[in-house]
Amino acid sequence: MLDAFAKVVAQADARGEFLSNTQIDALSKMVKEGNQRLDIVNKVTSNASAIVTNSARALFAEQPQLIQPGGNAYTSRNMAACLRDMEIVLRYVSYAMLAGDSSVLDDRCLNGLRETYQALGTPGSSVAVAIQKMKDASVALANDTTGTPIGDCSSLVAELAGYFDRAAVSVV
């Protein structure tokens, strides 16, 4: 896993070049956004349990066949596995948001996930809906500035949404 800083340095080093002004400007912007990034990650992680639980409830309300006999989330064991997987995706999205880079999400969570779900007979489209619901909840939290002098963080909220979109696309 590389954060945005390590990635830029590694790329420049591989080319045997100094960092360009554009690269330095991008890293400076990331430093300036650091507190906002931390605030967003804190909001998501502090509410992770509610995000996962409420997203799962909404998914099962829309797709009740998942929790009926024969459904992929039927039995407490399968339900627990579903909630665990949702929590893992949310956790790695928060890591990517903190790092400002999707490589940790891709490498440690998403690579091979579609194949795993296919092998288990889990409908990827349902997983994508669950991820979308977690995205909606997380974006709402990130946009809620009540009690937090977070300022304009629309680009960071878009970045957060992008990590969820990346995860949703990877499972279908």
UniProtKB/Swiss-Prot annotation:
Alphabetical keyword list: Antenna complex, Bile pigment, Chloroplast, Chromophore, Electron transport, Membrane, Methylation, Photosynthesis, Phycobilisome, Plastid, Thylakoid, Transport
N4-methylasparagine: residues carrying this PTM: 72
PTM comment: Contains two covalently linked bilin chromophores.
Membrane topology, from the record: Peripheral membrane protein
Regions annotated as coiled coil: none
Annotated GO CC locations: chloroplast thylakoid membrane; phycobilisome
GO biological process: photosynthesis
Places the protein is found: Plastid, Chloroplast thylakoid membrane
Record-listed (2R,3E)-phycocyanobilin binding positions: 82
Pfam family, one: Phycobilisome
Record carries keyword DNA-binding: no
Binding site for (2R,3E)-phycoerythrobilin: 153
Known partners and oligomeric status: Heterodimer of an alpha and a beta chain. Dimers further assemble into trimers and the trimers into hexamers. The basic functional unit of phycobiliproteins is a ring-shaped hexamer formed from two back-to-back trimers contacting via the alpha chain subunits. The trimers are composed of alpha/beta subunit heterodimers arranged around a three-fold axis of symmetry. The phycoerythrins also contain a gamma subunit which is located in the center of the hexamer.
Family to which the UniProt record says this protein belongs: Belongs to the phycobiliprotein family.
Function description: Light-harvesting photosynthetic bile pigment-protein from the phycobiliprotein complex (phycobilisome, PBS). Phycocyanin is the major phycobiliprotein in the PBS rod.
Official protein name in the record: R-phycocyanin-1 beta chain
Origin species: Porphyridium purpureum
Gene: rpcB
